[in-house]
UniProtKB/Swiss-Prot annotation:
The active site is at residue 364. The gene is sufS. It catalyses: (sulfur carrier)-H + L-cysteine = (sulfur carrier)-SH + L-alanine; L-selenocysteine + AH2 = hydrogenselenide + L-alanine + A + H(+). The keyword Lyase applies. Its EC number is 2.8.1.7, 4.4.1.16. This is Cysteine desulfurase. GO terms for cellular component: cytoplasm. Homodimer. Interacts with SufE and the SufBCD complex composed of SufB, SufC and SufD. The interaction with SufE is required to mediate the direct transfer of the sulfur atom from the S-sulfanylcysteine. Gene3D superfamilies: Aspartate Aminotransferase, domain 1, Type I PLP-dependent aspartate aminotransferase-like (Major domain). InterPro entries: Aminotrans_V_dom (IPR000192), Aminotrans_V_PyrdxlP_BS (IPR020578), Cys_dSase_SufS (IPR010970), PyrdxlP-dep_Trfase (IPR015424), PyrdxlP-dep_Trfase_major (IPR015421), PyrdxlP-dep_Trfase_small (IPR015422). It comes from the Bacteria. It is found in: Cytoplasm. One of its GO terms (molecular function) is selenocysteine lyase activity. It comes from Yersinia pestis. Pfam families: Aminotran_5.
Length: 406
């Protein structure tokens, strides 16, 4: 495999630093990925040479910034194969995107007695907004359970759907188990029953190509900071026909057509009616640079490289006798585990002393922890800049902890 890993690693400045006197092994990209120099430079260039408020001025700087921002909207649409740039809404991240759908689509189209379906593997961001909506409206939440291997049984979905069911919210890739759900098949079954489908793609877009039209989903959400882009910027894709029917969630500048103290307010068309206030313009520019970066490398080569690395990591970790792995064999991005009876926090703290960064805790997936009957897990996540040497350092660190703690 000819993936240019040395060049890729050189593109990420932070990977060259040391932590606790050790070369950094960064295995926490599922929480937030490191940034290539191209993304850092893009934001710096915008702030230094081109900053201005967008959509609010006739002067050259404002016009240039507006044009660049809208160009990124088109770029995002192309990246996920949306039908139109007007189906792309800039938000702060995945969490805000799901809240926007829950509070705009949900409060407009759902009513007491309706039901929605979520899965047992969802991130809290795809649980709590629906719980809040259900509590306010009297909507029932139905939970699609997992199999023993941490996967969804497709045939179990039909039993959850009846005449009251309106919406399915499902992750494409589990942020804990790495389970890659068969979204196209899931969406087809849900759409055949008349459901609207929201797909959480936060853990998918950096690992594999995404085509929202081929998937058939109504909404698709993801964050920039996990895609090697800046923090504070994310995307909500929504089918145009739905977005045009949805009321604004937040009010303010930029999302209006007219405002009158006597005749009320009329709102801009989608997507702008959902973008109240001043946007994170620099973050949008950085997101565009991040998409350029992964597109230039190619998502298929990235996927192939990461899958090879994942298979190697699972094979090496499986040799540690006291280590418990969670999730299916075929997965993307993340490896959840526990080491004997040792608390995940202790394992993570020891690894940090060896310069190895992993994530520990419930990973914003407490229902999943309850499913496995554990309070917490360790999670190592792989990205396009990780290597077999990183995996070997992790394995050696865990073996050292095993000997130290018994």
């Amino acid at each position: 495999m000819n993936f240019p890993i040395e060049r890729v690693r050189a593109d990420f400045p932070l990977l060259s630093r040391q932590v606790n006197g050790q070369p950094l092994v960064y295995l926490d990209s599922a929480a937030s990925a490191q940034k290539p120099q191209a993304v850092i430079d893009k934001e710096l260039h915008f702030y230094r040479d081109g900053y201005a408020a967008v959509h609010r001025g006739i002067h050259s700087l404002s016009a240039e910034a507006t044009q660049q921002m809208e160009a990124v909207r088109t770029q995002v649409a192309d990246f996920i194969h949306a039908a139109s740039a007007e189906e792309i809404i800039f938000v702060r991240g995945t969490t805000e995107a799901i809240n926007l759908v829950a509070n705009s689509y949900g409060r407009h189209f759902l009513a007491a007695g309706d039901s929605i379906i979520i899965t047992e593997m969802e991130h809290h961001a795809n649980i709590v907004p629906w719980q809040m909506l259900a509590q306010d409206l009297g909507v029932e939440i139905r939970v699609w359970p997992l199999t023993a291997t941490g996967e969804l049984e497709i045939t179990a979905l039909a039993a959850l759907i009846d005449d009251t069911t309106r919406l399915l919210a499902v992750t494409q890739v589990s942020n804990v188990l790495g389970t890659v759900n068969p979204i196209k098949d899931i969406v087809a079954q849900a759409k055949a029953a008349g459901l609207v489908v929201l797909v959480d793609g936060a853990q998918a877009v950096m690992h594999q190509p995404v085509d929202v039209q081929a998937l058939g989903c109504d909404f698709y959400v993801f964050s920039g900071h996990k895609l090697y882009g800046p923090s504070g910027i994310g995307i909500l894709y929504g089918k145009s026909a739905l977005l045009q029917q949805m009321p604004p969630w937040e009010g303010g500048g930029a999302m209006i057509k007219t405002v009158s103290l006597t005749q009320g307010t009329t709102f801009a068309d989608a997507p702008w009616r959902f973008e109240a206030g001043s946007p994170n313009t620099a973050g949008i520019m950085g997101l565009g640079a991040a998409i350029d970066y992964v597109t230039e490398l190619g998502l298929l080569p990235i996927q192939q490289y990461e899958q090879s690395l994942m298979h190697y990591a699972l094979a090496q970790l499986s040799q540690i006798k006291s280590l418990t792995l969670y999730g299916p064999t075929e997965r993307a991005g993340v490896i959840a585990f526990n080491l004997g009876q040792h608390h995940a926090y202790d394992v993570g703290s020891f690894l940090d002393q060896y310069g190895i960064a992993i994530r520990t805790g419930h990973h914003c997936a407490m229902p999943l922890m309850a499913f496995y009957q554990v309070p917490s897990m360790c999670r190592a996540s792989l990205a396009l800049y990780n290597t077999r040497e990183d995996v070997d350092r992790l394995v050696a660190g865990l073996q050292r902890i095993e000997k130290l703690l018994g």
